[in-house]
Amino acid sequence: MSAATKKRYITNKVGSEFYELAEEDIIAQVRQSRGNNLHEVLDQNGDSYVVSMPTKFRKAVWLRRDQFVVVRPIAEGDKVKGEIEYILDQDNVLYIRELGKWPSCFEEHALKMTREAKRGKANDKMIDDDMLPPSESEEEDDESEDEIEDTYDEDEETDDEEFDTYNPNRMQAPSK
């Protein structure tokens, strides 16, 4: 496989597949980049440490601060304690959350990614019902509907009458 093909394959894989968590996988949030493909992460247990990015992701996928990754711990490291297994996009975060495997310490970040939060529809009420202006009663709505129907009936009567307009496409002019 050429380098361009590998890059295209990894980019498509990250963007189109849902990741299934293994038992030893840890979800972590990227805090900062240390350089040389090393990143400082905060994991679901509250520990902060450095992880490495494998060769397959280098120059193909870019990490940003506060983005979520799946980390697989490695035993042979003093400073580097894990390797990035998968980079989670928004769809994967919501998928893992639906499965019930999303850590509770990152729940606030996952809630911001939901459709309801993006549309501005929150589950909890931010404005009390007492603070809202009073709504119109149903009686007023019934009266306004009757008025609209009366107006509509008057319009129908005028439609039945013939118009005295001249149509140049007719042979004769209308008689008055």
Curated annotation (Swiss-Prot):
Region (Disordered): 117-176
Biased composition (Polar residues): 166-176
Residue ranges, compositional bias (Acidic residues): 129-164
A Pfam family: eIF-1a
Family membership noted in the UniProt record: Belongs to the EIF1AD family.
Matching PANTHER family: RNA-BINDING PROTEIN EIF1AD-RELATED, TRANSLATION INITIATION FACTOR-RELATED
Protein name, as recorded: Probable RNA-binding protein EIF1AD
Organism: Caenorhabditis briggsae
